[in-house]
Amino acid sequence: KNSGYKIYDNYVYGFNIGDLVSTIKDKLNNNLIMIKNGQDIISTGTVFNLNNQEYIAVLYGDINGDGKINSADLLKMRQHLLGMIELTGPFKKAASIVNGTSINSADLLRIRQHLLGIKNITQ
C-alpha cells in the first residue's frame, strides 16, 4: 500500500504537522512497531521501527523537534546560520526546506512566510 511517505537514507519525509502516531499506524496497516520518543505526535527526530528497520522522521520546518513550526524553529535556524549552534542529523534536514541539501537565508525566509501565513511549508 502506497502511504505517500518518502524514504531517503533511513529518513522518512511526507508527514504533516500534527500527524499522530496512531494515524500513521493505520496508514501503514499497523506495521509500525515501535516509537522511541514516546509522544503521540510525529515530530522531527521521532524514531520508529518498520519491518525491522529503524527510521527517523523529518518534518520540514520543525527544527527543534516539537512537532510544530513556530518561532522556536526560526530562532534555531538563525542560530545555525550565525554559527552559534550546529544543526545535525534530522534537524539539519528539517531546516533545509528550499532545496533539501543546504541551509541558507532562503530557508529562513520560508519559515517566516509560513509563520506569517503567506506560504505554508509543504512536506
What name fits each language-model region?
Residues N2-Q123:
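Cellulosome-associated attachment modules in secreted, modular CAZymes
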